[in-house]
Amino acid sequence: MAILRSREIRDMSLEERADELENLNSELVRERALTSAGGAPENPGRIGEIRRTIARIKTIQHELNEI
């Protein structure tokens, strides 16, 4: 899943943002489960990228009074 930039997130509809947020949260859970099970993630920086993208989406939702 590609990391989204602020402009891309703003261009999404309300439902698309909510779906993307749900997908990113589930991906974050999978990555953390892999790490906690003792496995080495394919891309160690991916967890940070996912967290930052989630924060971007939530920030924009807050700015647009969607939360």
Curated annotation (Swiss-Prot):
GO biological process: translation
Keywords of the record: Ribonucleoprotein, Ribosomal protein
PROSITE patterns assigned to the protein according to its UniProt record, in alphabetical order: RIBOSOMAL_L29 (PS00579)
One Gene Ontology term, aspect cellular component: ribosome
Annotated transmembrane regions: none
Alphabetized InterPro entries for the sequence: Ribosomal_uL29, Ribosomal_uL29_CS, Ribosomal_uL29_sf
Record has Ribonucleoprotein as a keyword: yes
An MF annotation (GO) of this entry: structural constituent of ribosome
Gene3D superfamilies found in the cross-reference section: 1.10.287.310
Family named by the database record: Belongs to the universal ribosomal protein uL29 family.
NCBIfam families named among the record's database cross-references: L29
Protein name: Large ribosomal subunit protein uL29
Organism field: Methanosarcina barkeri (strain Fusaro / DSM 804)
Encoding gene (name): rpl29
